[in-house]
Amino acid sequence: LGNSILNTANADGKDFGEFKVEGFPTSTASDLVTYGGNNDDDDSGILRYVSIRYGGSVLTDNNEINGLTLGAVGRGTTIEYIEVFNNSDDGVEFFGGTVDTKYMAMIFNEDESFDIDQGYRGRNQFWFALQKDVGELSDFGGEHDGGDGDDKTLEPFARVQVYNATYIGGGPDGKTGKGVFNLKDNFAGQYHNSVFMDFRGYAMAIGGESTIARANTAGDLSFENNIWYDIGSYDGTAASLTANGLAEELANVSEKGNTYANPFLGGTSRLGNGGLDPRPSASGAAYNTPMSSVSGGFYTPVNYKGAFSSEENWLKGWSHLDQLGYFDEPAAVKTDVEVVADITTDTTWSNDNNYLLG
């Protein structure tokens, strides 16, 4: 939890609101469960090579425990190489903030893979979502809200940027009617150079169209140069991009170089039999269709669409997905080391072990 700006009002109805993190009663007095402030450069530390497994809980409606909850975390924080595996709610949820992330993998989670709320405005690259392919267990790839509560006019709007995502849905046996995205409530984000495939529902459902239009008077909402494949119909034909066809307000969603084409990934098996390979063919659409350029020091310039190149799988060697044998060769079994004492000095941990925090 951090101290960057939310688009929720404080008790006086003014900016720089604070919130209690989900999973605790709103009457909880401790600052340890409170997030929000006025420092977008807030530093909440470093998370790198972290695997979060078999967690989460749905306590009540709109009161859940996500795999990773980021409340008002600022851009001074480092978050990269994160896996959330088989969580019973969202994989990750951003509640406002400005934190930048890279190499995020949301695997087999039972609600959304990536959830955005309360005016999140970070930069992101190399996001991977893989959803369950059995029954009614996984929702949208991304549920992206600009804000919450009754007042949808509060700023800042959610002007998040995502480059190089790969979202693989549940396929023809996945959850009924759940598509790639659910956008609503002043969302004004962007996706570029990404691959979205294997979802039963629409590519995009749009709610609260009046608030979406208000947040996007400058055309900030943009889905540019992405690949869409096997969305809804599963017969090789292009599916409708939006559920309610707001073409006038949202031309940037359906235009700007979006392509309906097979990215020819190496494999999408969810059986743990070595048949999963999210890398695209170098001779396919991921390498041979127009791309958005990147600028600034955060983004890594690459010549492909999606979260993976044709050669490298950045989940190999450390992720639970790899350890369970989903890729072509299972990773070496690591030793579990239980950590029960407080860590008060600089400590070096080995990649040969799994460290279990007690």
Residue ranges and their predicted role:
Residues 1-89, 93-344, 350-358:
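Extracellular beta-rich repeat passengers
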